[in-house]
Structures are given as C-alpha cells and as structure tokens.
Amino acid sequence: MEGEYYIIKSPDGKVLEVKDFNTENGAGIQLWSFAGHPWQQWQFVDAGEGRWRIQNRFTGKMIDLALGGVVEGTWLHQWSRTSGLSQCWTLEPTRSGRTRIRNVLSDKYIDLVGMNTANGAQAQIWNYVAGGNQEWTLERIDPDAAQAGKRAGEAKDPQPTPSQRKHQNDLVRKLHSAGKGRAGRKA
C-alpha cells in the first residue's frame, strides 16, 4: 500500500480533490472532473485499529473535518497531520461494489453538499443515507499513466465493471486487514 495513490470517485465519475490546488491548511475538498492532477490523488496512511488518514499527493495534507466539527453538514478540508480523530476514517464496502468512507470522530460519512454532483460541489459529512451520494470507488492510480491523466483500468462507463468491483472489494479488505494488523504505512 505504501507509495500507492488512489482517486476517490463518485458514481458519476468525478473525483474528490483539493479546491484550487491550494496547499494551505483549510483548503476545501470538492468534487471535480478527473484530469490526473496530483491534487486529485490520495494515499491511505495506516492510523491503526482499522483506521486510515487520507493524505493528498500534491499537498501532503490530510482530509479533515472543518473546525473539528461533528454535526451533519460539516465541510471537509485539508489540514496538516494531527493526532486527532477528525482525520481518521474507516472504509465500509457496499453491495454496489463501492465504499462508504466514515469519519471516526463524527461517525458520519463523506457526502456532497445538497447532493450536488457538479464540478465544485463541496464535500461534507452526513449521517448514513441510502444511495450513491455516499458511495465512492477507490481506483488505484497507475504510476506510469498518472501524469497523462489516466486511471488504472479506466472505463468510460461510470458504473464499476465486475473487474473494478472485485478490485475495489479486494482493496477495501486489504486496507481493513492492514489497519487491524498494523501492516503497511504507519501513522
């Protein structure tokens, strides 16, 4: 897992990124069309006990809860690594072959403000709701193709293929088991 980067893709094919490729603490996390940029790529850093910090490739900062908030609608932003649980996440596989990403501190899921799927939609946390707005596909970035803006196993259809779904499920199991076994990159 160490050194591997992923995109966090919504059901419509857009991905989470750092807004305006800003390197400062507090820069928002938003949805945008995939273009292969490093501010759209994330590494899962083992935080122990099945928890993960999600670190941006470009900025080196973690997805965090704005102001450490825990209520529905708290926006996501990036922040330098801390020891706080506001930067810790668990991964939960879904029947659709995607993954829900739950914050440990708030016990809420990564979601989009107003269920918006347009470029620039702000990411937030929200209680569990059925449906695709909280379901994400974690796609490994092919290191050789990353600069060319291509994903490993890229498909035109935003629905995951059986092969992508299997890879997704394998990845979530691998991340979950690595976190419990304290293998992989340490927090």
Each model region followed by its residue ranges:
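Extracellular glycan-recognition/adhesion modules and their associated mucin-like linkers
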Residues: M1-T23, Q41-V70, C88-T117, E135-A187
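Short, tandemly repeated low-complexity microdomains enriched for cysteine and small residues
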Residues: E24-V45, G68-T90, V113-A130
